[in-house]
Amino acid sequence: MKRITAIICLLLPLLSAFFASAADSPKREFRGAWLHVIGQTQYMNKTPEQQRNYICDQLDKLQEAGCNAVIFQIRPTADALYKSEIEPWSYWLTGKRGKAPEPIWDPLEFVVKESHMRGMELHAWLNPYRVTSSTKEVLPANHISNREPQRFVKFNGQIFFDPAYEENRQYIADIVADIVARYDIDAIHFDDYFYPYPAGAKKFDADGASYAKFGNGKNKGDWRRENVDKLIELVSATIKDIKPWVRFGISPFGIWRNKSTDPRGSESGGLQNYDDLYADVLLWAEKGWIDYLAPQLYWTLDLKVAPTRKLAYWWNDNVDPKCHLYIGYDVQRTMNNAIGNKPNELSTKVDLSRSLPNVKGNIWWHGYWVTGNYKGALDELASTHQAFLSLAPAYGDTSITPSKVTNVHAGSIDGHNVITWDYPEDYAGAVSPASTEEQEATDPVKFVVYEFFEGEEIDLSDPRAIIAVTPLNAVRVDSAEKGTVFIVTSIDRMNRESEPSQRMIVK
């Protein structure tokens, strides 16, 4: 008896943590993960078939961890992990810039399809200005930076598009337009690289010629910020002109300005977006140019120079509420740092995000640490913090809802019991992703299946009732007992949910 009591006592903290997290688990929460390719040699060392299998394995594990969105890098250094008529194939895909995969395939097309099959969003991640990532990289003679060198700057051994040139802004917008028009992505995502980061104590100083040409006597800092502002405004308009439902998200460095620089700033002492990268991210949110911000709070909770806890509160209080706010957390630092009687900071950070009224989710840096189960990160997310399925936050006018599904009924597929339903007439799966003129924001793109046991209250706000999010019109329910109730809803391109279907009761 004492032994049983001892075991129960040992389990109680774990059980209480699980049930506390379960009770707080929201139905709507952005749960993303970054999958970068820059610096990741595993892609170039695989055959196309192995690359596809690897991507599927990463997506499977992120799905297991409870993620509902993937931010996949497709343009790390003015190159492409997709079929492009504008830029060369990426070195990080094949080992040589401009070399196509053999046999040919399209990673972006593939990852969009596979993410959507798992009920996950796909955000196409581009670095806008970076051309090279190291001093060792040699660009071909016909590269645009060699053909029009005046449009580029060199700093710290790297090459960048000069943000001052209107031609560069239009070039980047054309890249975005091509991607948005041809691929069924959910968002365009830029990271934190705008004007180059300082190289140690040396700040960026390589734009003297363009300042002399375009500066018109303006304060240089203001002029640089204006150059980046123009790009963000142009990219935003470009996206919305093609597909209004495709979102534009930015993941900036985690500090806007320090309070020592600006009384509106945060209690921090690190590098600053506004002053060092010339990125006025709060302005972009206020102007409505971006749909979400995901500041990179990659530090430990109470690091003196950059305390994630205080910074999360600061972003919550200062980002315009019409712009969605997600927090980017570093998995490795989170799992390495014990806090109080907890072995890591994971539960505290998840709880922190959920406690802040304007924070609508998290993004994990990087996804490979999740899929690799770094110090149990995947296990803890899957079993506790993201144990129940969650829908990404809705955008736009939420009074508008998509068409509901009809004819929900029990059936059998390949000997398995299933719940199936009829697709709405405007189901997006019936429309080619390239046929932009036929697409609407209200097109249903996936379906949510709810399960309630006999006698259980029907509550569609309870995420514990969600058993599947799928673009298909059937789910397996082999173990459904008599009296179980199933309800299905549609989700449109803006993540808005339809009215519920009729109830299907297992006889």
Where are these regions (language model features)?
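Active-site-adjacent "subsite" loops/lids of carbohydrate-active enzymes
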Residues: R28, W34-H36, Q40-N53, A124, ...
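Aromatic-lined carbohydrate-binding/catalytic grooves of carbohydrate-active enzymes
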Residues: A65-E102
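Active-site neighborhood of glycoside hydrolase catalytic domains
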Residues: E167-I175, A181-E267, L271-Q296, D302-L311, ...
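Catalytic domains of carbohydrate-active enzymes, especially glycoside hydrolases
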Residues: N53-A80, R182-D186
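Pro/Thr/Ser/Gly-rich low-complexity, intrinsically disordered linker/stalk tracts
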Residues: G376-A441, N495-K507
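Beta-strand-rich modules
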Residues: V477-S498
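Aromatic- and acidic-residue-enriched segments that line the glycan-binding/catalytic groove
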Residues: A80-G95, R130-N156, D192-N216, S260-L271
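Substrate-binding cleft of secreted/luminal carbohydrate-active enzymes
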Residues: Y278-L282, E286-K304, P321-T398
